[in-house]
């Protein structure tokens, strides 16, 4: 991809893991991820954060090789290439989201739905307000995109934490 991804959000099955055993599973998964990434050119950090596992690229890396390595880890069911941006307020976030959509989907006609989650509750807008506002910003800037909240081609995820994570 042309876009510069700095991280990967790792999704894993949580169905059978509740309570005390969950951290054992997560720690084993983190160890396994670290192990497969040793074979990949590049430096990575693997971090558990509030029920998520992130793989951060700390150097240049081979995108395809990294994805292939992560696919070999048992227990992972999703690998989301993620753009991580500093939280510099709504205006900057909006610019980043619009740039992301333009880069990822060029001029292809697509329907989309925004999915904003705020782990950082101190953020001045609610998730609902951000969904509406960011969706409007994308519509204004990307004439090829249309909203479809029921069956969108694309879900554009924005997670507001200490930093902001964009993926789709």
Regions found by a protein language model. Name each.
Residues 2-168:
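RNA-binding accessory domains that recognize and position tRNA/RNA substrates
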């Amino acid at each position: 991809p042309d876009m510069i991804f700095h991280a990967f959000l790792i999704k894993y099955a949580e169905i059978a893991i509740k309570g005390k055993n969950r951290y054992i599973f997560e720690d084993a998964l983190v160890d396994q991820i670290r192990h497969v990434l040793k074979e990949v050119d590049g430096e990575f950090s693997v971090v558990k954060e509030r029920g998520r596992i992130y793989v951060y690229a700390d150097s240049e890396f081979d995108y395809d090789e990294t994805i292939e390595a992560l696919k070999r880890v048992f227990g992972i069911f999703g690998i989301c290439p993620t753009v991580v941006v500093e939280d510099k307020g709504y205006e900057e976030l909006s610019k980043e989201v619009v740039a992301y959509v333009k880069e990822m989907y060029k001029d292809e006609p697509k329907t989309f739905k925004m999915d904003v989650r705020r782990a950082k509750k101190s953020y001045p807008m609610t998730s609902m307000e951000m969904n509406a506002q960011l969706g409007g910003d994308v519509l204004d800037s990307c004439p090829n995109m249309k909203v479809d909240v029921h069956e969108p081609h694309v879900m554009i995820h924005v997670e507001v934490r200490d930093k902001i994570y964009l993926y789709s």
